[in-house]
Swiss-Prot record:
Protein name as annotated: Protein translocase subunit SecA
Cofactor requirement: Zn(2+)
Keyword Nucleotide-binding: yes
Known EC number: 7.4.2.8
Keywords (A to Z) from UniProt: ATP-binding, Cell inner membrane, Cell membrane, Cytoplasm, Membrane, Metal-binding, Nucleotide-binding, Protein transport, Translocase, Translocation, Transport, Zinc
One Gene Ontology term of the molecular function aspect: ATP binding
Length: 907
C-alpha cells in the first residue's frame, strides 16, 4: 500500500527514467535548427570532430545530444525519415546498456542507428544482432546509407560468406548479423591455428533486435559445432523396429488406466520405461541379438543401447511429422517451434535425429561429436556493453535483470494505442472452434477488413488453409515453407479483405501497412535511372495518391483484425501476435479462439472448464467468453514461463562450470597462438611429466628397497625414448640418492631434446611445438566436452544419495578438467620426446592441422536439442573476448588457488 502511494506521488522508476531522457530530448531538439542549417559537407565533418573529441578523453554521454541530432538530420536527408522524440528516448536507453521495449511499428530499426553511430565513434566496433539473414542484410543496406553518409563503414555478417568477407565485415564500424553467426564465429575463432585466421576483433557493444526471442526463447539452446563421430546406422534401424513393439502406459501411479511399457512426460519431452517395459525391452532385444543372454539392459556395457532405445521411443511418441519436422528431399528438416521456420541443415543431437530418420525411412546420416559449444547467455555476457530492443520485454523483465543484469525501460508510443483486445472464446471441441474462426474470417472479408490468423505450427496452418479452400475463401499462407516470400506477403497483409494465415509471427521484422505497402514500387521509381528527378517526384506522388483511399478504406473498416487459434506457452508470443495490429495509433482488434482440446488447455485448464460446460449444459457451438477464463489461462502461461525460466537458469548454472573452463582453455589457446616461442612452456611441462613418472617408481621419502628401477627404465624407454642405465649407476655409486638420480634424468632428457632440435631450423621447430600443443589441447577439449555432457545427463541421480547434484557436478567437472590438463601435458611431452624429425619438410607436413569431417553448426536445444544450419565452409571465426585472467587472480575453476598455481600452469 505504501509503495503504491509513493509510486503515485513520485512515479515508478520507469516514469522517472523517461522524464530524465525527455530532458535530453529537449536539448537535442534545441540543436535541430543549427544542425539542419549545415551543408552536407559540414554535417559529414561532424563525425571526424566527434572522433577527435572522444580520442581526447571526452565521454560519449557529453557528445550524445549533438551526435543524436546529427544522425536525425542524416536520416532526414538520406531517407526522408526524421527520428521521433520517443525514438530518441529509445536510442538513449540502448546507449545506456538497457532493454528498450517499443511497440511494433515504432521504428526500432531506425532507433538502432542512434546508439550504433555514437558508440562506433570509439573505433571498437558495434554489433547489431537480428534474428535472420534477410533482416540483417536488409537493415545493413537500409541503415548503412545513413552511416555511409556520415563517413562510417557498415558490414554484414552472413552465414554463407567467405573468410575474407567476414574479416572485412567485422573490421567495419558497425556490423549487422544474426545471433547464431556471431556466436559461431566466436567458437570458430577459438579453433584456428594462426592469429590471421580469426575474424572477430573483440566484443565491445551489441544491440540485440528482438532481444526476448534471442536472449530468452533461444537461451535454452546452446550453439554447438560438431564433427562426424562413429556410425551406428544398423543399431538405429533395429531399434526403430523395437519402439512400435512397446506400448504407452495410460495414467501414472495409483491412476493407471492401462498398464504399458513406458510413460511420457510431455512438458519435459522425455520417455521413461516402466518395470514392465524394462522386462519386455530386454526380451525383445535379446531375441534380436542386440542384448547378450543373461545380461541386463543397465549393465555398463549396454549404456549405448539404452541411450539409443530411448531416442527411438522419443522419435516415435514425442516428435511428429509436419509439427516438429517435415520430410523434404529424402531428409528430415526441423521446424523451429518459436518461429515456424524450416531450419535446413540443423540436426537434433544425442541420436534423436537419426532415430527420426529411421522412423521416416530416409537416409540415416552419421552422429556428430561436439567440437565447441557455448550458450547465448555466456556469449552475450562477454560484451563490454549489451542492449536490446523488442515490442514485448516487460513480462520477462525479471529474467533479463537476474541473468544479464539488463534493466527494461518501457518507451511510450509516438501515438496512443487504440487496438481493441477482446476476451478469449473457449469451445468444448476443436471443430466448434474452427467453425467460429471461419465465421469470424468470413465476417472480416465481407466488411473489407484485413485479417491475420496466427497458428502455432505448420500442421495447423495447412489444416486451416484446407478448411478455407473448402469454403472458397481465398487467402495467403505464411509458414516455414514460404519464407523466401514472407516479407512481401506480410507487407501486403493489410490490403482490404486480405486473409493471411501465419505461423508464429515473432521476428518477422516487416510491418503490416494498412492498405498494403507500396515500398517496392517507390524503390523501383527511386532506382530508375531513366527518370529525371522531377519525373521521380511526380511518379512517387501519384503512387501515394493511389494508395491513400485504399488506406483510408481499411481504417474505416476497423484496421487489421488478429485471430489467435491457440494460446502459446508464453504470453509474450501471444502479445507479439496481437502487436501486429494497432501500429502507430492505427485502429485494430484481436481475439483468441480456443478449445478444450488445445495442448495448453489439456495440460492446465481442460478438466475444470469441461466440468463447468457440462454443468451449464452449454449447447454445441456456444463458447465461454469471460475475463476470468482469460485470467486463468494467463495464470497457466505464467506457470509455464516460470518453468521455462527455471530450465534456463539451471542450464546457465551448469554451463557456468563449463564456461569457466572454456575461458581457461581459450585463453591458453590464444597465448599459444600469439607466442613466437613456447619452448620454455614445453620444457617446464616435460620436466613436470618426467618428475611425475619418476615418482611413480621412486616414491618421495622411500628407501632403495622400495624403488622399482627396472620398471622406471622401461617406462622412460617406451614413453620418452630415453634409455638410461639407472641400475648400473646405482651399482657403481651405492650412495646415490633419489634427488641426484632425478637431476641426471632431467639433464639427460634436456640433452637428448637439444640434439633433436639442433637438426632443424629453430623457427620451424617452435611452430611445430605450438601446433602439437594446439592439436592436443583441441582433441582433449572435445573429449572433455563429451564427458561433461554425459556427466550432466546422469548427475540428477546423485539426489537419491542425499547429495546436491550441482555441487557434485562442479566437483566432478573440476576433477575431469584436472585430468584433461594432465593428459595434455603428458601427451605433448611424450610426443615431442619420441618424434623423429630429420628434415623441415617432415615438420611442415606434420604441422597441417587435422581436417574435421562433416562439420556442422548446431543450435541444439537443452531439452529439445534443436540444431543449427550449416554455416559456410569457407567461413572462419570469432575472436576471444571477456576480461583476461591475471596470473595472480583467483582461478575461475573455483579451487581457491591463484591462476598461476592452478589452471594457468600450462601457460
Amino acid at each position: 500500500m505504501i509503495s503504491g502511494l509513493l509510486k503515485k506521488i513520485f512515479g515508478s522508476r520507469n516514469d522517472r527514467l523517461i522524464r530524465q531522457y525527455s530532458q535530453t530530448v529537449r536539448a537535442i531538439n534545441a540543436l535541430e535548427p543549427e544542425i539542419s542549417a549545415l551543408s552536407d559537407e559540414a554535417l559529414q565533418a561532424k563525425t571526424a570532430d566527434f572522433k577527435q573529441r572522444v580520442a581526447n578523453g571526452e565521454s560519449l554521454d557529453s557528445i550524445l545530444p549533438e551526435a543524436f541530432a546529427v544522425v536525425r538530420e542524416a536520416g532526414k536527408r538520406v531517407h526522408g525519415m526524421r527520428h521521433f522524440d520517443v525514438q530518441l528516448i529509445g536510442g538513449m536507453v540502448l546507449h545506456n546498456g538497457k532493454i528498450s521495449e517499443m511497440r511494433t511499428g515504432e521504428g526500432k530499426t531506425l532507433v538502432a542507428t542512434l546508439p550504433a553511430y555514437l558508440n562506433a565513434l570509439t573505433g571498437k566496433g558495434v554489433h547489431v544482432i537480428t534474428v535472420n539473414d534477410y533482416l540483417a542484410s536488409r537493415d545493413a543496406d537500409w541503415m548503412g546509407r545513413i552511416y555511409g553518409f556520415l563517413g562510417l563503414t557498415t558490414g554484414c555478417n552472413l552465414s554463407r560468406m567467405g573468410h575474407e568477407a567476414k574479416q572485412a565485415a567485422y573490421a567495419s564500424d558497425i556490423t549487422y548479423g544474426t545471433n547464431n553467426e556471431f556466436g559461431f564465429d566466436y567458437l570458430r575463432d577459438n579453433m584456428v591455428y594462426s592469429t590471421g585466421e580469426r575474424v572477430q576483433r573483440g566484443l565491445s557493444f551489441a544491440i540485440v533486435d528482438e532481444v526476448d526471442s534471442i536472449l530468452i526463447d533461444e537461451a535454452r539452446t546452446p550453439l554447438i559445432i560438431s564433427g562426424q563421430a562413429e556410425d551406428h546406422t544398423d543399431l538405429y534401424l533395429k531399434l526403430n523396429q523395437v519402439a512400435p513393439m512397446l506400448a504407452e502406459q495410460e495414467g501414472e501411479g495409483d491412476n493407471v488406466i492401462k498398464p504399458g511399457d513406458y510413460t511420457l512426460d510431455l512438458k519435459a519431452r522425455q520417455v521413461l520405461l516402466t518395470e514392465q517395459g524394462h522386462e519386455n525391452a530386454e526380451q525383445i532385444l535379446t531375441r534380436m541379438g542386440l542384448l547378450a543372454e543373461g545380461t541386463s539392459l543397465y549393465d555398463p556395457g549396454n549404456i549405448l543401447l539404452v541411450h539409443h532405445l530411448y531416442a527411438a521411443l522419443r522419435a516415435h511418441s514425442l516428435y511428429h511429422k509436419d509439427q516438429h519436422y517435415v520430410v523434404q528431399n529424402n531428409e528430415v528438416v526441423i521446424v523451429d517451434e518459436f518461429t515456424g521456420r524450416l531450419m535446413a541443415g540443423r540436426r537434433w543431437s544425442d541420436g534423436l535425429h537419426q532415430a527420426v530418420e529411421a522412423k521416416e525411412s530416409v537416409r540415416i546420416q552419421a552422429e556428430n561429436q561436439t567440437l565447441a559449444s557455448i550458450t547465448f547467455q555466456n556469449y552475450f555476457r562477454m560484451y563490454g556493453k549489451l542492449a536490446g530492443m523488442t515490442g514485448t520485454a516487460d513480462t520477462e523483465a525479471f529474467e533479463f535483470h537476474s541473468i544479464y543484469g539488463l534493466e527494461t525501460v518501457v518507451v511510450p508510443t509516438n501515438r496512443a494505442m487504440v487496438r481493441k483486445d477482446e476476451n478469449d472464446k473457449v469451445y468444448r471441441t476443436a471443430k466448434e472452434k474452427w467453425d467460429a474462426v471461419i465465421a469470424d474470417i468470413r465476417g472480416c472479408v465481407e466488411r473489407g477488413q484485413p485479417v491475420l490468423v496466427g497458428t502455432t505450427s505448420i500442421e495447423i496452418n495447412e489444416f486451416l488453409s484446407g478448411e478455407l479452400n473448402r469454403v472458397d475463401l481465398s487467402h495467403q499462407v505464411l509458414n516455414a515453407k514460404q519464407h523466401e516470400h514472407e516479407a512481401e506477403i506480410v507487407a501486403q497483409a493489410g490490403r482490404p479483405g486480405v486473409i493471411t494465415i501465419a505461423t508464429n509471427m515473432a521476428g518477422r521484422g516487416t510491418d503490416i501497412v494498412l492498405g498494403g505497402s507500396i515500398e517496392r514500387q517507390l524503390a523501383a521509381v527511386r532506382d530508375d535511372e531513366t527518370l529525371t528527378p522531377e519525373q521521380k517526384e511526380a511518379r512517387t506522388a501519384a503512387l501515394r495518391e493511389e494508395w491513400k483511399p485504399v488506406h483510408e478504406q481499411v481504417l474505416a473498416n476497423g484496421g487489421l483484425h488478429i485471430i489467435g487459434t491457440e494460446r502459446h506457452e508464453s504470453r509474450r508470443i501471444d502479445n507479439q501476435l496481437r502487436g501486429r495490429a494497432g501500429r502507430q495509433g492505427d485502429p485494430g482488434s484481436s481475439r483468441f479462439y480456443l478449445s478444450l482440446e488445445d495442448p495448453l488447455m489439456k495440460i492446465f485448464a481442460g478438466e475444470r472448464l469441461n466440468a463447468i460446460m457440462v454443468r451449464l449444459k452449454m449447447p454445441e457451438g456456444e463458447a465461454i467468453e469471460h475475463a476470468m477464463v482469460t485470467r486463468s489461462l494467463e495464470s497457466a502461461q505464467r506457470k509455464v514461463e516460470q518453468r521455462n525460466f527455471d530450465i534456463r537458469k539451471q542450464l546457465l548454472e551448469y554451463d557456468d562450470v563449463a564456461n569457466d573452463q572454456r575461458k581457461v582453455i581459450y585463453q591458453q589457446r590464444n597465448e599459444l597462438l600469439e607466442a613466437d616461442d613456447i619452448s620454455e612452456t614445453i620444457r617446464a611441462m616435460r620436466q613436470g611429466v618426467l618428475h611425475d613418472s619418476f615418482r611413480v617408481h621412486v616414491p618421495v621419502d622411500s628407501v632403495e628397497e622400495q624403488w622399482d628401477i627396472a620398471a622406471l627404465e622401461q617406462a622412460l624407454a617406451s614413453e620418452f625414448q630415453l634409455r638410461l642405465p639407472i641400475g648400473e649407476w646405482l651399482k657403481a655409486e651405492p650412495n646415490l640418492d633419489d634427488e641426484t638420480i632425478l637431476k641426471r634424468l632431467l639433464a639427460a632428457a634436456e640433452e637428448q631434446y637439444a640434439v633433436k632440435t639442433a637438426q632443424v631450423d629453430p623457427v620451424a621447430w617452435h611452430q611445430f611445438e605450438r601446433n602439437v600443443m594446439l592439436q592436443s589441447l583441441d582433441t582433449h577439449w572435445r573429449e572433455h566436452l563429451a564427458a561433461l555432457d554425459h556427466l550432466r545427463q546422469g548427475i540428477h541421480l546423485r539426489g537419491y544419495a542425499q547429495k546436491n547434484p550441482k555441487q557434485e557436478y562442479k566437483r566432478e567437472a573440476f576433477e575431469l578438467f584436472e585430468t584433461l590438463l594432465d593428459t595434455v601435458r603428458n601427451d605433448v611431452s611424450k610426443l615431442l620426446m619420441t618424434v623423429q624429425v630429420r628434415t623441415e619438410a617432415q615438420l611442415e607436413e606434420a604441422e597441417v592441422p587435422p581436417e574435421l569431417e562433416n562439420v556442422q553448426y548446431q543450435h541444439a536445444a537443452f531439452d529439445e536439442a534443436l540444431g543449427v544450419a550449416t554455416a559456410p565452409e569457407a567461413a572462419q571465426a570469432a575472436a576471444p573476448a571477456g576480461p583476461k585472467i591475471g596470473r595472480n587472480d583467483p582461478c575461475p575453476c573455483g579451487s581457491g588457488k591463484k591462476y598461476k598455481h592452478c589452471h594457468g600452469k600450462l601457460s
